[in-house]
């Protein structure tokens, strides 16, 4: 029996649309992510458990974990009969890499169970492919940090899919999920087909400056450069109360604030625990819309997906 935990992730980070992502873990020890268990069996079966299991497709073939099993078996050239259990602790359509959690946990669990026949690069490529089935296009900005941990920059050249970018230990990520769903496909459809030259230049400057600031250990400069001219100006209309929440977070001392992934989760970056707590309390009172919403104060999850049983 193998049990794997895969952590939540925040893609884009305002400054790196489709090319940056960070794995996150709550400072209070709460597990924010999915678990997948694999056990030997005579034939394949899949059981869904966890807080958000009711949101999953009822037909096993439509479940991404089943599709991961099928693709993994095809990849290694043999059918491996197993009993799989998905603990779905992540809300779907939250902007926290929910589908990536399930994909990464399922594939890592299968790879561990079978004695690691696939290497890291092949695993990551397969993860991107599976993620693409849900979002409509292959992208790695959730699966790469979820699998490998830390902040990841998508390279996709010379056989390298992604590489780690050094983060800052003092950064606290306040993540507020309001409890509503935003589909990745819908959030992509709202974006323009073409961008103005000055927006392209600003985007390049922000992203290059951010990566430079990370490597030269300038946390305040890095945070200052976390600006989004590509997606946020268009996606805010899908997120009730986002503009007010961002303004409030910045006034309370957040270093940066933006949309996590395609939303509706908001992230606010703080460098002091008391600031993070103030921002978290405000968001809990004003940004959440129902009982399914939550706020977590997180740090970077540097471990990524891991065997927990």
From Swiss-Prot:
SUPFAM superfamilies: GHMP Kinase, C-terminal domain (SSF55060), Ribosomal protein S5 domain 2-like (SSF54211). ATP binds at residues 91-101. One of its GO terms (molecular function) is homoserine kinase activity. GO terms for cellular component: cytoplasm. InterPro entries: GHMP_kinase_C_dom (IPR013750), GHMP_kinase_C_sf (IPR036554), GHMP_kinase_N_dom (IPR006204), GHMP_knse_ATP-bd_CS (IPR006203), Homoserine_kinase (IPR000870), Ribosomal_Su5_D2-typ_SF (IPR020568), Ribsml_uS5_D2-typ_fold_subgr (IPR014721). It is an enzyme of class 2 (transferase). GO terms for biological process: threonine biosynthetic process. Its EC number is 2.7.1.39. Pathway: Amino-acid biosynthesis; L-threonine biosynthesis; L-threonine from L-aspartate: step 4/5. It is found in: Cytoplasm. Keywords: Amino-acid biosynthesis, ATP-binding, Cytoplasm, Kinase, Nucleotide-binding, Threonine biosynthesis, Transferase. It catalyses: L-homoserine + ATP = O-phospho-L-homoserine + ADP + H(+). Its main location: cytoplasm. It holds the Pfam family GHMP_kinases_C. Catalyzes the ATP-dependent phosphorylation of L-homoserine to L-homoserine phosphate. Belongs to the GHMP kinase family. Homoserine kinase subfamily. This is Homoserine kinase. The lineage of its organism: Bacteria, Pseudomonadati, Pseudomonadota, Gammaproteobacteria, Enterobacterales.
């Amino acid at each position: 029996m193998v049990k794997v935990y895969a952590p939540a992730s925040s893609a884009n980070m305002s400054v790196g649309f489709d090319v940056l992502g960070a794995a996150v873990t709550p400072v209070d020890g709460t597990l924010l992510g999915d678990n997948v268990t694999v056990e030997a069996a005579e034939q394949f079966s899949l059981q869904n458990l966890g807080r958000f299991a009711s949101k999953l497709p009822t037909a096993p073939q439509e479940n991404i974990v089943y599709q991961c099993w099928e693709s993994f078996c095809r990849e290694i050239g043999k059918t491996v009969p197993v009993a799989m259990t998905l603990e779905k602790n992540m809300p779907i359509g939250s902007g926290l890499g929910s589908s990536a959690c399930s994909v990464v946990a399922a594939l890592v669990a299968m790879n561990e169970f079978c004695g690691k026949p696939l290497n890291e690069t092949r695993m990551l490529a397969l993860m991107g492919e599976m993620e693409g089935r849900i979002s409509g296009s292959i992208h790695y900005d959730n699966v790469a940090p979820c699998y490998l941990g830390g902040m990841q920059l998508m390279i996709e050249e010379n056989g390298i899919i992604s590489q780690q970018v050094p983060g800052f230990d003092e950064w606290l990520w306040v993540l507020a999920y309001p409890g509503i769903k935003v589909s990745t496909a819908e959030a992509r459809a709202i974006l323009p087909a073409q961008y103005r030259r000055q927006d392209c230049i600003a985007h390049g400057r922000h992203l290059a400056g951010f990566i430079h600031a990370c490597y030269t250990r300038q946390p305040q400069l890095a945070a200052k450069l976390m600006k989004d001219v590509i997606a946020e100006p268009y996606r805010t209309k899908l997120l009730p109360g986002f503009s007010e929440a961002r303004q409030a977070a910045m006034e309370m001392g957040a270093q940066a604030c933006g949309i996590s992934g395609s939303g509706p989760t908001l992230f606010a970056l703080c460098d002091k625990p008391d600031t993070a707590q103030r921002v978290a309390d405000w968001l809990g009172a004003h940004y959440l819309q129902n009982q399914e919403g939550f706020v977590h104060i997180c740090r970077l999850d540097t471990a990524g997906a891991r065997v927990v049983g």
